[in-house]
Amino acid sequence: MTSEQRREARYRRRQTRRQAKRKARNDALGPIEEVFSYRAMFFYGRKCCNGVRWKASTQRFEMHLFSGTAKRRRKILNGTWRPGKTAHFTLKERGKVRPIDAPHIEDRQVYKVLTKKVLVPLNVPSMIYDNKASQKGGGLHFHYRRLAKHLRDHYRKHGLEGALFLMDFHHFFPDAPHALLYERHRGMILNPDLRQLADLVVAAVPGGVGMPLGVEPSQQEMVALPSSLDNRIKAQLSIHGAAHYMDDYYTILPSKQAAEVTAADVIGHAEAMGLQVNAGKSKVVPFSRPFRFCKAKFQVTDTGAVKIHGCRDGMKRARRKLRLFQARVASGEMTVEQVAQWLQTPISYYENFNDHGRVLKLRRLFYAIFKTEV
């Protein structure tokens, strides 16, 4: 038996084990009648009401939850359920305009069951540990801690030598290819009824591209979408210091040449998948220089300490708002106590980072304006 034949045999054994595990995960879900059981739909229907019970539509939904759940479950089981229209509006978040498509609460009930009972159990096992956006036990600050750990690990081996490759996707949600999502469904969801339902949610966006912001299955689909790229970086390229948060990637390499070679490989693989790479934000930076990841500034000192600073634009906004509130307090529209309560928001944000100096500056500015301590 040649080495090539042994390699092929090992590959086939791995494929067989993966297929067996995938089948076991799908068998654990059960048929569509068990996944969308009345109990599960009622439970997640109540979950949808949390935090929005002041809305009239939510109150009507909860008032008729018993009968409405039975009606929607009947439509799902006989294959006549279709996603309804969404309420479209735009948000301007820190200067970034984001189009939001909010589904009706009746559709949110179905979406939540699909996400919690189907997409999460089937997608998460194929995702790397360093992909924890919108996942239980994860989040943005989880990724800050992981990046700090990866920087310290690299420093212990290579010191300040090396480089980072930072990558960002362009229009990650608006230009998501539906064909890639359907391909993932065919590989992950073996039950044809559940796969058809997941395809319906994707097909609700016309044009064959794009996933809406504000829809729960959309968020889970997009988190897991680049999993093949993640596994290529982690498994095939064997890069320990690599992770991504939604559309933001970083990889830590021992040299600038290795970072440039990895950048070409990763960008080529991403574009082959149909994902658009933002060339303006994708770059190679020296390990010894500070860089930004998800609006936070990271820097490794000569002693190996990792310093993390919050977004500096927040200080500009806080100072501008304090001067605005000064005029409102003078006119009687606000009280000093209300301003002090608001100031806790930027202070609490910067207390998560190595920004004690910025916290002191905000407190001093508040004292200079209102002659009292916060």
State the predicted function of each range.
Residues R74-K96, N191-A204:
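Reverse-transcriptase-like RNA-dependent polymerase core
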Residues M1-T16, P103, R108, K112, ...:
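Right-hand nucleic-acid polymerase module
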Residues M1-A70:
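Non-catalytic, polymerase-adjacent accessory regions of viral genome-replication enzymes
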Residues T86, A243-D247, A279-G280:
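Short Gly/Ser/Thr- and Asp/Glu-enriched loop/turn motifs at secondary-structure junctions
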